[in-house]
Amino acid sequence: MSVNDNINHNKKLLEKYVIEDDLYNFTQLINEVSCDDEFGYKLTTIATQEASINIIKYVFDTDIIKCFPKHQMLRYAVGLPSLGYFTKNKDEFHNSLELMKLLLQYDMNNNDFPISEYLYNAVKQNNFEKVKLLIDNGINSLKIISRYHFENKYIYNNHEIVKYMIDNGVDIQGFNLSYALHSCIISDNNDGVEYYFNIGANINDLDLESVVTIIKYNRIQKLFDYSYNFNKLDYLLDNEENNNYDEALNMLVELTSIKTKNVCVLLSLIMSKY
């Protein structure tokens, strides 16, 4: 076997030991292999993906190789749903939560990285254990990234996690109480609706698009149940289309005390938008 072949063989063995979290064989071989930064990054990236906790701790404690940045490891351990990057959950010891516990023992500071992303991704996965662990370790900021409320429904609809964060003083930047209420209504999350009402949400603060989507998702009864004031729609009455509906709408009006034209506005919006 040539020298290069031997080096490549040993590198393959090291990768195998990292995947298996075989610390004994890893330590026996690592000193025999010249690890440049690129290969060190590769090994510790694999270790992060595989939740090879023994290997990672050894590398941190010895600085034997240049490792994948710690804050990037934590991103993998928390999970990146938008990119499909996750640490594997193999058993009670080799899993993403245990890896997070290990990583958070070390300095995770990186001035160029928004730490709010950790909490955002944990909440998006509805992973209460990860959310609690991050908050307990001082990560108490979450930024709701998108201005489109339908993209944040996974956060708003997790009202129990939202409650935990609020109760524990997390700074939730970009949080919109009306969008949170809307998300729970269209998801038929009655407990979430009740919670958001309790902390100040108002059904009549919903914007028109939210009202339309609630009707689109067959939740119009919820608007009646929560006493939405349909007559707020007066400002949209100057629309000739609203005069083209039959007498069936009058029956609806008689049963609900809603102005006919306001119902027409909603129906025309639904047809034009969806």
Swiss-Prot record:
Asked whether the UniProt record includes Repeat among its keywords, one would answer: yes
**Where does the source fall among the domains of life?**
Viruses
Tell me which UniProt keywords the record has, alphabetically: ANK repeat, Repeat
List the signal peptide residues: none
Q: Which InterPro entries match?
A: Ankyrin_rpt-contain_sf
Q: Which Gene3D superfamilies match?
A: Ankyrin repeat-containing domain
The question of whether Repeat is a record keyword is answered with yes
S-S bridge residues: none
Chain positions of ANK repeats: 78-112, 114-144, 146-174, 176-205
State the name under which the record lists this protein.
Putative ankyrin repeat protein R597
Its source organism is: Acanthamoeba polyphaga mimivirus
Classification from the root reads: Viruses, Varidnaviria, Bamfordvirae, Nucleocytoviricota, Megaviricetes
